[in-house]
Structures are given as C-alpha cells and as structure tokens.
C-alpha cells in the first residue's frame, strides 16, 4: 500500500493550480442521467472518487469519454451520454466506495420512475444519515422502501410531482438530490432551507444550461419549475475551494508565499477571513489568491457551519496549521460528530490538542517532529500532510488512498513549490 514521505522544514513558494472541485463534479456527473443528450464537463479533476463515479454511471448505461481539455482550461474533460438507461440499480460493490453514489437516486427516479441504490460508503465521519434525501423524494410523491441494505424508490404513475420540501437542517447532498429530482417533476417544487454551498450553485448553473428552470439560485429557498425533458450542455466545473484552502494552510505553516491559481475568493470568503485573522497576508489577484505568511501565526476561535460559514471540510487543515500558532485556539465542530480522528496522529507529531465532545482546544507549540502517522479520512489525511511540511525530520503518512479521493497530483503540486515529498509504494 502506498505511503507519502515528507521531509519537513521547506518554505513553500510559487504557484499551485487549483483543480476542478471534487464536491461539485460528483453531483454534476449524475446529472447526466437526466437527459439522453451528451453532457460535457470541463476542468475534470483526476481523482479516485471521479473514477468510482464513472464506474457507477457506466454500470447504469452511461457512456463516458475522457479527453484532454481544449482552449483556456488545462487538464481533462469528460463527455457523458445516457441515451438509454441500462439499469436502475446501483450495486453495493460500487456504491460502498463512495458516499456521493447516493446522488444517482434522484436523477434515476426522475427519469425512469424507479431506482434501487445501495446504502453508501465513503468517509468514516459519523453516521451521515440519508433520511433527508428520502424525505425530500417522498415530498415529490416517491414511495421509499429500505430493504437488505438498499433504498428502493418508485415514482407514482405519471412520474414525480412538484411539492414543498422543507429541510429541518441544512444538507448539501439532500439538496442536490432534491434539485435533480425536481427538475423533471410535474409542476412546481419549492425547497426551503436549501444548502447554499458554491457547489450547489454550480450544479444549478449546469442544470439551467441543460434547460432546467430554477429560481433563487444561491439562496436558501429554491423554486423549480419542472420540465418534460432536459438537453445536453457543456459546463466548466468550478475550482475546488477546499483544495485551495488546504494549500493556503500549507503555505501558512511553512512561512510560505503561494499563489492559488484559479481560486475564487467569493467561494471561500469565510476561510479567507480566518486566514487573515491568523496573521496571513491575503490578496486577490487577477489569476487567483495569493497567500503570504510574513508574520507569526496567531491562534483562532472558530466554529464550522453551513455555507457561508466556515466549512467543516477545512477544520482538520486549520487545526494542523494552528498547532504552530501563538496562543490557544478553540475549534468547534457543529456539522459532523466523530470528525477529530486526526487529533491522535497530530499529537504523535508533538501537537498539544485536547478534545471534549465537539470542541478541540489547540495550544500552540514551538515545533512539530516527523513521525509515522495513519490517515483516517480525506481531510484528516491532508491535515497530516500540512503538519509534516513544517515538522522537523521525516514523516510517513500511511493509507494515502484517502488523499487520492480528493487531491489531484498532490505530490507534484507541492514539489513544484518547494516541498520535499514523494510517494513510496509497498
């Protein structure tokens, strides 16, 4: 099994290109099920989760063709064509690899009137129940049955019908499933307390390019006017705000100066506020966001929250950065339980962190030391990379398959800005 070896103490300096957003593309790809025409997504990241999504869509009858992007967008593009649906069953052996597989449920149900999807796998972060997804589809008339580890959903005669969906708590995935189901439902659907994340906006923009009628994009109340059919489109995947924030933390902890090429400030406003508060110099430039660490890091008090609040997906990376900040930091995780699994590994490297319930108290230390550490989930693994970049000596991060789910060409990007990092097989 691969591991990543890092020799810390090198200041990061240069440009890091930000890839297409993982959390956006994993909703955009299932949207191809909503039309028999082709959907082309530009700025496709090279990630294990993208490969898993391709495998699942192929199983359902979607043809996928990946090519090098043309024009102004570097990297890859994918064309997905679901001219016929070969199966409405998303099997366990594929779905278990990736939680986002549940996002085929809404599109399949909307187009075919039925869907059977295995309960999902993916990150080991709390329970992440899918009950909000199911309640949303029931509000559109679906009949839902849970049996033998599968969700079986069936639309009423004549297909899904518009309705009112009111989420008791904000859920990104449930909002995405509800939107994709509603665009082909008969009549009008109102979604109250919808998630407002930039990835939701990106999905809506793609669906509208395909002919969907959605009002209120970017707000917590969406009104969707169902269509008989959608057509094909070409859409550019938004830049990954979590990847950009992660590399900002890496620049900060190494005293670096890095331009996050392609990052959009509007997508990560609260992260930038906290980075500035920690003592970093942040400037928005024509082609990205520049992060300069020209002063000692300062401790922070922050809580995770749905967008536009501080993202839970950045909590672990900030914790690693704050391990070397002056003073005491207090982090409160309000979104997921059990999202402090990286703490014991950071402590092995010399961090002073105490966790009580949903609150973590980080007392800044003068230095970290390299160690062998184990990644437990996607963002936790990145926190260990960040800590290792500043640690004295060598760190080996095991179970790096977690990183491959969400960070494209990690070693290549960090090496290009001065990190001593390599992937070791076996």
From Swiss-Prot:
The modification 2-(S-cysteinyl)pyruvic acid O-phosphothioketal is found at residue 123. Keywords: Cell cycle, Cell division, Cell shape, Cell wall biogenesis/degradation, Cytoplasm, Peptidoglycan synthesis, Pyruvate, Transferase. Its main location: cytoplasm. It catalyses: phosphoenolpyruvate + UDP-N-acetyl-alpha-D-glucosamine = UDP-N-acetyl-3-O-(1-carboxyvinyl)-alpha-D-glucosamine + phosphate. The active site is at 123 (proton donor). UDP-N-acetyl-alpha-D-glucosamine binds at residues 99, 128-132, 313, 335. The keyword Chloroplast does not apply. Pfam families: EPSP_synthase. Its EC number is 2.5.1.7. The keyword Membrane does not apply. GO terms for cellular component: cytoplasm. Phosphoenolpyruvate binds at residues 22-23. CDD domains: UdpNAET. It is found in: Cytoplasm. NCBIfam families: murA, PRK09369.1. PANTHER family: UDP-N-ACETYLGLUCOSAMINE 1-CARBOXYVINYLTRANSFERASE. This is UDP-N-acetylglucosamine 1-carboxyvinyltransferase. It comes from Zymomonas mobilis subsp. mobilis (strain ATCC 31821 / ZM4 / CP4). The gene is murA.
